[in-house]
A protein has these predicted regions:
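Short, surface-exposed "cap/lid" segments of acyl-processing enzymes
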Residues: 1-36
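Active-site nucleophile elbow and catalytic-triad environment of alpha/beta-hydrolase enzymes
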Residues: 190-209
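Short beta-strand/loop motif that positions the catalytic acidic residue
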Residues: 213, 219-221, 225
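Conserved alpha/beta-hydrolase "acid-adjacent" motif
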Residues: 226-232
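Catalytic histidine-centered segment of alpha/beta-hydrolase-like enzymes
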Residues: 227, 247, 251-266
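Catalytic histidine neighborhood in serine/cysteine hydrolases
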Residues: 233, 238-255
Length: 299
């Protein structure tokens, strides 16, 4: 809901969706759409309901009783809430650099501290505009607007670098507005009050208790993530009731870990192996060596 879905299908060879399909995993991506002015009243409950409709549609299309959910960044937070509310619908959950303990949110948490940040004032005129979202993330690393061009000048002769750079630039600049009511809840209840981590977050009158989650859980963290520091994500594993829960650490930042040059060799096969070892035993042996090479630690 902050950037568009295709970061997980960026371009051939640098696509998590493509890799999952190549490993024999039926894969579906949820496009949240682009909010219009009238969507300012799209609240948190309706956002979770949209995710629930997606799950029902995938189940109808595949005939499966349950689905494995993978959520990236805010999508992971939303998916964790959904899984806690409807644990019987989810066979496995992959938290891909998504914050759960927002008190560990680093600079982004400081940026939206309630002492100086009012999400209601920010959205008084309607949806939060896309440029404001982009500027907020840029403020976490102000020099990145310049350093990326220095990097391009330094590496443009490397095979495929310019293509990857342009694809990522296209996606990074393709921001969308954030629905006002959903934004207010996201910032106030999760970032400022940390209600999800405290077990006090309610959706439609139901408490989102992460302790309800008993399915296998994999939390993926990026070692240099400034948007979701590792501790903000690994809190997931502290709260779930799953007997099968692991942490996978990938080198890189919040975006680089997912679409960077190492992602096709590190992230994609490791996540595929984790899923296949649980739901496709016949295919697991040929991937087990890849999983062993990754920094995977069982909790």
């Amino acid at each position: 809901m902050i950037n568009k879905w295709y970061v997980l299908d960026l371009r051939p060879g640098f696509s998590m969706a493509e890799s999952m399909v190549e490993h024999g995993i039926d894969t579906y991506l949820l496009d949240w759409g682009t909010p219009n002015d009238e969507d300012r009243y799209l609240n948190w409950e309706l956002v979770i309901a949209k995710l629930a409709r997606m799950v029902r549609r995938v189940k109808r299309h595949t005939g499966a009783d349950k689905v494995a959910l993978l959520g990236y960044c805010m999508g992971g937070t939303l998916s964790s809430i959904y899984t806690s509310l409807y644990p019987e619908q989810v066979a496995a959950f992959v938290n891909l650099t998504a914050p759960i303990d927002f008190s560990k949110g680093g600079l982004l948490r400081t940026l939206v501290d309630e002492q100086w940040f009012d999400p209601y004032a920010m959205t008084a005129a309607g949806n939060l505009p896309a440029p404001q979202m982009e500027n907020g993330f840029t403020s976490l690393r102000p020099t990145s607007k310049f350093s990326k061009w220095i990097m391009l000048a330094d590496k443009y002769q490397r095979e495929g670098f310019v293509e990857s750079f342009n694809a990522l630039e296209q996606w990074a600049g393709d921001n969308i507005p954030f629905p006002a009511e959903a934004y207010q809840t996201y910032i106030h209840e999760l970032y400022q009050q940390n209600l999800l981590y405290k077990g006090k977050h309610f959706v439609g009158g139901k408490r989102a208790d992460l302790g309800n989650i008993t399915c296998p859980v994999l939390t993926v963290v990026a070692s240099r993530d400034t948007i979701c520091p590792p501790a903000a994500a690994t809190a997931m594993n502290e709260l779930v009731s799953s007997e099968d829960e692991s942490v996978l650490t990938i080198s890189g930042g919040h975006v680089g870990a997912v679409v960077g040059s190492r992602a096709p060799k590190q992230l994609y096969p490791a996540v595929a192996a984790w899923l296949i070892e649980r739901f496709g035993k016949d295919a697991a042996p040929r991937l087990r060596d890849v999983n062993a090479e990754a920094d995977v630690t069982a909790e």
